[in-house]
Every structure is written in C-alpha cells, then in structure tokens.
From Swiss-Prot:
This is Drebrin-like protein. Residues 325-335 have a biased composition (Acidic residues). It comes from Dictyostelium discoideum (Social amoeba). The SH3 domain mediates the control of pseudopodium number. The keyword Nucleus does not apply. Actin-binding adapter protein. Binds to F-actin but is not involved in actin polymerization, capping or bundling. Does not bind G-actin. Controls pseudopodium number and motility in early stages of chemotactic aggregation. The gene is abpE-1. Residues 291-300 have a biased composition (Pro residues). Residues 228-237, 336-413 have a biased composition (Low complexity). One of its GO terms (molecular function) is protein kinase binding. Belongs to the ABP1 family.
Amino acid sequence: MASLDISDPDITKYIKLVQDGNPANRWIVFSYVPKSNNKIKFCDSGSGDLKELREELDDSSIRFAYIRFVINNMPKFVYIPWCGDGVNGPIKGAFSGHAIEFSKSFKPIHHQVNARSEEDIDEKAITAALNKATGASYDSGSKVQGATKGTFIPQSVSQGREAATKSNAEVKNVINKNDYNKIQESAEYWKQNQANKSEPAKPTRPEYNLSTERDDYWKQQQAEKQKQQQQQQQQQASRVNAPPPSRTVGNKFQEQVSKPTETAPPQPRPAPSKGSVLNRFPAATQQQQEPPAPSRPAAPVPSRVNKPAAPVQPVYQEPVHEEPQYEEPQYEEEQQQQYEEQPTEEQQYYQEEPQQQYEEQPTEEQQYYQEEQQQYEEQPTEEQQYYQEEQQQYEQPTEDQQYYQEEQQQYEQPAEEQYDQSGYLQAKALYDYNGENDGDLSFREGDIITILDQSDPDGWWQGSLPTGEQGFFPSNFVQQL
C-alpha cells in the first residue's frame, strides 16, 4: 500500500479555518485525486449543519469529513471517514490505513465516526458522545445508589458547576426506598451470624440441646471423677511410701512373732552353737562342699555381777529389691534375736536386777561395753560375709514373690480408658435415642457403644452396637468410658 500524499496546501488551510471557528467554514470534505489512490485534495466546505454535510457523501465515493460542534459553549470536532458500499474492493483495503494516517492531520479530534451508510451518521448519537467527552459533560454522575437521575443536561458552564456541587442532602432524596430495606436486612443478617458464633458448639439439631438436668448430671460426674483421681493419687503415694512385699527370712520371723502364741507350753531352745544359721541351709553347704564359716565370737563378759543387760536396739527391716548390702543386717538381727530370746543365766540374773539404778548412774564398764558393741556391729566378721554370700544365692524370687510383684504391677497401672478387643473406644448411653434420619444409630439407656469416628466438629460420632448396627449419634447422649 502506497503512503498517503497530503502535500496539497489547501488541506492545512481549510483545517485551520474550521478550527479557528470561521462561520463560513463549519465543515470540510477531502477526497482522492482522480486516477490516484493515495493523493488527497480539497473537495468542498460549508457553513451548514450535519444534514448539509451528509449530501456530499454518496455510496460510490470515499470522503474524509471534518465538522465543528458547539457543546456547552465549547467547540468540539468530529472526524468522519466515509467509505460507501459501492466502492471497489482494493480501494476499501487501502482506505482503512489512509483513514488512520490522515487522522493525524486533524487535531484536535473529540470523536470519530467510521461511517458506511447514512444511518451511521446520527446527530443525536454524536451530540451525546460529545457531552460525555472530557471537559464537555458537567453531570455529577448518572447513578447514585442504584437510582438514575433525571434527564437534565446543563446548557452552560455555570449550570454544570451548580449540578456538580449539589449537597449530599439533595442527593440522598433520590435514593430509592428499597435500598434502605436492603441495608436493614443486611444489618440484621450479620447480627444473627455474629450471635450464632458466640454460642458454644452443639449438635446442629435443636431438639438435642442440653437441658439443665443434663448439665447438673455432667457436673456431678465431673465432681465424682475428681474425687476418684484424688483417691488414686493418695493410694499411689501410700504405695510409694510402703515397702514392697517380699519373702525374706526377716519377714518370716516377724510373721511368726506377730501370730498369737499357741496354748502349748514353750520349750526351751538349745544354746546357739557355731554355724547355727548355716544349719538352715544344708543343701547349699553340701553342694558347695566348703568348710563351715567361723562362728561369731562371743561378746566379752563383764567381771561385775551387777552389770545390766545391753539395751535392745530396734530392728529395721530392709527391702529385698535393693542392693544386697542393705540386706546384710537381716541375718545378724535374726541371730541377735535368737540370742535375746534364749538368755543365759548371767543375762537372767542381770534382768532380775532393777534397771533404773544403773540407768541413772552409768558406770565406766557400761560405756566400755557399748563402745565395743558398736565396733563389733560396724566391722562385719568373716562369718557375716559368708552369710551374705549364702543369702545372695537364696535371694532368687520364689513363686510367691513373683505372684506378689505381678499383682502389684497390675494394681499400679492406671485405668485410663476402656477399649474393646478391636482397639476402639467405648461409650455408655445415658439416654434413649431413636434415629429419625437415614444413617442414625438408635440405642437405649445403658447400651455400650463402640466409637468408630469422632472427627465431626458438630458433635456427631459414628459408632456400632454389639448387635452389629452402625450409624451416627449425638455425642451428648453418651459418656465415654
């Protein structure tokens, strides 16, 4: 396509006359030079309106028109490239490019109309478009809160400014009453939504809301649960403080002492001899085939006859489950008790004497005897060491001890939650429930329900009965075991 030739000086001359507001030249028309498809020439001009210009446009020609309008005392310019329906095809293809290129010579252009027939050139449509153009329409807005304003069009700049500066009070009078109703409805809707959010989460159905009786029942259940927890804590504390059950030689001796004495007359025991404790375990001595341990040396006997007996020290029980060194005094205490149960003639004589006389004035011999006894108890002899080795062999837990330990472990395990054989949680029905919808689980008060799913945030759980029925039920009708 050849470039457009606008070298004719009349083109710029007449364009200038139209833009300057010359009354004799309101519109101008340009066309191609005959036998040329790219050179433009001046065709005609006039002082009339758009109807006069339309007479210069026919179906078999191409024209470029430029017309001046006055809108609100302001000049507005319209560019109309015209291509009739009877124009040849090749010329139509070049026309679109020439129209765009020629529009650069018409400045300013407030509106452009690409016309193909007389119906495209409508004066009312062009005037409305110019009113909406920048700087031409002084309307403050065609719509206010959904209502359309009147068809008032300002005829001057002062009228446009007055319409644009109307007060808000006058604008509110135009608002439709339906808008007020919509505002009120939306406000009530949001109030209800906010009120529903503040309430605690409960099942969606209103007929399953908790009543005051159920609230009292749950409070009572919580109080009982707290009491049970306190009792369990107290029992655990007492079990920690109490020694574990054991079956040692010292415990057997204490059980025999605590039993009521039989009616049979007590028979005197023989005096303790060497290896008296070892005689209790003949099987172990035969297997080891070791010589008997040396016997405990006898305590020194004071020379004075009126010497009181040594004060009996309390016997403290040592737990079996601890290290063997704490079990060491058991044999020593047992042996000491045997000596105390069978007093010799000298000890009987000492016990017959009143002890109060000697307790008020302790002699030097008593102090010496007490110090020597402490040294003897602090330093274990070879016989005590042998007893310790013997005891370690027989400290293996018997069947009774294993049974006591297993029973104690079972008792110390806290009962947290009950599970069925499949590993699911269980719950107990507090009220009767008849399912109204498909998929609901019906049950009676006291039924045991296996809980399958608790993920519903609205409080509807899925469970099954022992009969095999499955379904959904409200969580506030059951108590988890």
